Amino acid sequence: MDIQSKAKKLIEMIQTAPVEWKPLGEIAEVSAGNSAPQNSAFFENGIYPFCRTSDVGRVHHSINFYQIQDKLNDIGIKGLRLFKKETILLPKSGASTLLNHRVMLTIDSYVSSHLATIYRNEKIVLAKYLFYFLSQFDVNELIPDKSYPSLKVTEIAKIKIPIPPLEIQQKIVKILDKFTELEATLEAELALRKRQYQYYRDFLLDFNNRIGGGIADNYKGRLKDVVWKTLGEVA
């Protein structure tokens, strides 16, 4: 059975399965990270990841997030809370709040106070299921003043989440994982084709042979008739 057939069958199962909508705060702990240490000495020879809004922004959306630049040392982590892997992060203050960044940690990390943190109740909801659902929620609906964007943890906790049985959640996750894998493959292929296009575009239009080995090398002596004109002369 192909992935589309499985998806259709799953939709039929969901329609008959008992689904209860619950506030996020009832099925997960919704909180925020720690204030960032200001002393640069706390980051010297650091080994403990400290996730900032900028880290999340660089990735934008990822269910396998680990790309964290700053690392704290033993002194820097004193008094800070460590967040478990599978914690979902999203910006809660600043302009990036409007961009719907969403990631899920794959490593235990310390987290900036500018990020909201969501860690699910393992007995009620699967981490990936919760991430996939939250990924299609537009947090702009919770921001009253777009000129001063901010999200309150209390408002995030009110987001309603559909909770089917764990067995159904697992099947949903399995299919969405397949689509995510397919999307990543297509994006990689598209990036490759884009690089190929750029290479051949530059090769074919390089009349001055600035990149070396371009069209000028292949047609030596035949490009003397090429005339350079201003754009205004030809358009």
Question: What residue spans do the PLM features occupy?
Answer:
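Amphipathic alpha-helical segments
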Residues: 1-4, 16-20, 160-194, 198, ...
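Non-catalytic DNA-recognition/assembly elements of restriction-modification systems
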Residues: 12-34, 218-235
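Long compositionally biased, domain-poor regions of proteins
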Residues: 59, 98-99, 120, 135-145, ...
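Accessory (non-catalytic) regions of SAM-dependent nucleic-acid methyltransferases
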Residues: 1-14, 56, 209-214
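A short glycine-rich beta-alpha junction/loop motif
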Residues: 109-116, 147-164
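Coiled-coil heptad-register positions
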Residues: 190, 194, 201-208, 215
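Sequence-specific dsDNA recognition surfaces
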Residues: 27-39, 54-85, 232-235
